[in-house]
Curated annotation (Swiss-Prot):
Gene Ontology CC terms: cytoplasm; DNA-directed RNA polymerase complex; primosome complex
Protein name (database record): DNA primase
Positions bound to Mg(2+) 1: E266, D310
Binding-site list for Mg(2+) 2: D310, D312
A single GO BP: DNA replication, synthesis of primer
Keywords: DNA replication, DNA-binding, DNA-directed RNA polymerase, Magnesium, Metal-binding, Nucleotidyltransferase, Primosome, Transcription, Transferase, Zinc, Zinc-finger
Cofactor binding note from Swiss-Prot or TrEMBL: Binds 1 zinc ion per monomer. Binds two Mg(2+) per subunit.
Zinc finger region(s), CHC2-type: 38-62
Reactions performed catalytically: ssDNA + n NTP = ssDNA/pppN(pN)n-1 hybrid + (n-1) diphosphate
PANTHER family noted in UniProt: DNA PRIMASE (PTHR30313:SF2)
């Protein structure tokens, strides 16, 4: 497959890397650049840097990064062609892929993508079955009676799976999809006795489940006739894994970043109703506990998480367990306590959207405040529990990262123990870091290294200084490169990465007139070389080289080659001494070739 270079350039020019990365990483301005937690490996202290000026990103921990295409390839685990297509769709640039297409009606790049295509194609027919067929009328009425407008149904892509064992099966087969792959995607079930396939979802209202990029990867089928189970979800598949999926994250991401808060609900139905009521930063897990993968992803967007679970005993227990775990992970945890026996959907149905949004805004407690209010009766009447929970709450408050929030929690919690905030503070070890949290350094987190200046440059070895400075000057402009390219033998570089960078610059200037790091990284396909390019970019040398400066670097680099010739001469003399004619011929040929390269 090949994409015209002009299309690639247009997409790159229209895609701002800061906007792109911000969809996945919570970034903070630090000097000239932005920093955040790396999306490619788990970390507690930010080491991922984005340069808006240079349009590149780079992790100083795992070394991954690059321009907008390489970031997209890495974050979505897709090919370069797929990344170009994805970003092209994002900026409304049509991507014409020059390739010989197969005769199949289904053009795909991987099994995973084909599975997603199946889900998205069948969604259109589920929606049609719900809104345009007689068989779907009862399901549609059921939704409408529960406040689902036509606009909301369309927005959420809700549909209806007919009461047929082969509706989905026959449709996908006619479209040319592999039935075994449809089974692996979770759309079909299989009779293990005769290995026949049939629809997994029948006579159910179908709610699409999307990944963080907004692609449909699964379904939740809800009964409307009382059959069990109430909800039938897609099974675990290569594209649908509950421990990684947060419902509504694709829609809520921007609001989460803007509000610097994520609100976690128990179910996707609560999310739909809460979002409709005006609460836009809401997500839910798919019937599973909040996983480490969930927490890692949340961390990249915000450090503030609010739990709003059902107002029953199970909801309270889940809030205490989840909140404790989140607090241990270094997040700021808050709780919205719904009235007894109610969930968000029921609250909205009873009091209306405005009352719900006001309640969410005004009834938010810190996790410590919520916890002590739940345990207040036991604290008041059980002296053993009093001591236990005093220590627990003291520790919980110590885990809070903000001193202001700590003081607020002290004021809220102390009255439940009939002590002053000062007395409660005495129980707290403020210098105790959470068990699973790495404290920030003395500057409050990762400090972006400054570009290497002259002082650091002087500390390098003579050879390394020459090689790095020489390449840095070649990066300034094409004329400098052309003037000096023939002056140096690439094999004289002591650093193999520099040798390859030298070749990269040759390829780059063959197609470009002006050096740009964002474009240059597209010419390398390894993290090590990308790291070398970015490292060279950080060198801060004189604006203009002094007279003969570059020539001096050339001489130093070529001295390494001369040393190689001297070594060959020594070996030639030794071969002559011992009378090895074959070795003499070999070393003589090497010396002649080496001298020709230097002419």
């Amino acid at each position: 497959m090949r994409i015209d270079q002009s299309i690639i350039n247009e997409i790159k020019d229209k895609t701002d890397i800061l906007d792109l990365v911000s969809e996945y990483v919570k970034l903070e301005k630090r000097g000239r650049n932005y920093i955040g937690l790396c999306p490619f490996h788990d970390e507690k202290t930010p080491s991922f840097t984005v340069s808006e000026d240079k349009q590149i990103c780079h992790c100083f921990g795992c070394k991954k990064g690059g321009n907008v295409f390489q970031f997209t390839q890495e974050i979505k685990d897709i090919s370069f062609v797929e990344a170009v297509k994805e970003l092209g769709d994002r900026v409304n640039v049509a991507v014409d892929i020059e390739a010989t297409q197969s005769n199949s009606n289904v053009q795909i790049a991987s099994d995973d993508l084909q599975m997603i295509e199946m889900h998205e194609l069948i969604q259109e027919f589920y929606y049609y079955a719900l809104t345009k067929t007689v068989e779907g009328e009862q399901a549609l009425t059921y939704l409408q009676e529960r406040g689902f407008t036509d606009a909301l149904i369309k927005e959420r892509g809700i549909g209806f799976a007919p009461d047929s064992s082969h509706f989905c099966h026959d449709f996908l087969q006619k479209k040319g999809y592999d039935i075994e792959l449809a089974y692996e995607a979770g759309l079909l079930s299989r009779n293990e006795e005769n290995f026949s396939y049939y629809d997994r979802f029948r006579n159910r209202i179908m709610f699409p489940l999307k990944n963080a990029q907004g692609r449909i990867v699964g379904y939740s089928g809800r009964t409307y006739t009382g059959q069990e189970p109430k909800y039938l979800n897609s099974p675990e598949t290569p594209i649908f894994q509950k421990r990684k999926l947060l419902y509504n994250l694709d829609k809520a991401r921007k609001s989460i970043r803007k509000l610097d808060e994520i609100v976690l609900l128990e179910g996707f139905m609560d999310v739909i109703k809460s979002d409709t009521a005006g609460l836009k930063n809401v997500v839910a897990t798919m019937g599973t506990q909040l996983s480490d993968e969930h927490i890692t992803f949340i961390r990249k967007l915000t450090s503030n998480i609010t739990l709003m679970f059902d107002g029953d005993f199970a909801g309270s227990e889940a809030t205490l367990k989840t909140g404790q775990h989140l607090l241990q992970q270094g997040l700021n945890v808050f709780v919205i306590q719904l009235p007894s026996g109610m969930d968000p959907d029921e609250y909205i149905g009873k009091y209306g959207n405005d009352a719900f949004t006001a309640f969410v805004k005004n009834d938010k407690k810190s996790f410590a405040h919520y916890k002590v209010s739940i345990l207040k009766d036991e604290i008041a009447h059980n002296d053993l529990s009093y001591e236990r929970y005093l220590k627990e709450l003291s520790h919980d408050i110590s885990l809070m990262k903000s001193s202001i929030l700590q003081q607020k929690a002290l004021n809220d919690v102390a009255p439940f123990f009939n002590v002053s905030p000062e007395q409660l503070a005495n129980e707290i070890q403020f210098n105790q870091a959470p068990a699973n949290y790495y404290p920030e350094d003395e500057y409050g987190g990762y400090i972006e290294p400054e570009p290497i200046g002259m002082a650091q440059f002087d500390n390098l070895s003579r050879q390394e200084k020459a090689e790095r400075a020489f390449l840095k000057h070649l990066m300034r402009d094409k004329d400098t490169f052309l003037n000096y390219y023939e002056s140096v033998d690439k094999d004289n570089f002591t650093n193999q990465h520099f040798k390859y960078v030298f070749e990269v610059l040759h390829d780059f200037y063959a197609e470009n007139d002006q050096y740009n790091i964002s474009d240059a990284v597209q010419y390398v396909n390894s993290n090590e070389l990308r790291e070398t390019l970015i490292s060279l970019e950080q060198y801060s040398l004189n604006d203009e080289p002094y007279e003969n400066e570059i020539d001096d670097y050339v001489n130093v680099i070529n001295e390494n080659g001369q040393e190689t010739i001297e070594s060959l001469n020594h070996k030639l003399r030794e071969a002559t001494r011992i009378g090895d004619v074959e070795l003499q011929k070999y070393y003589l040929q090497q010396i002649v070739a080496k001298n020709k390269e230097r002419m």
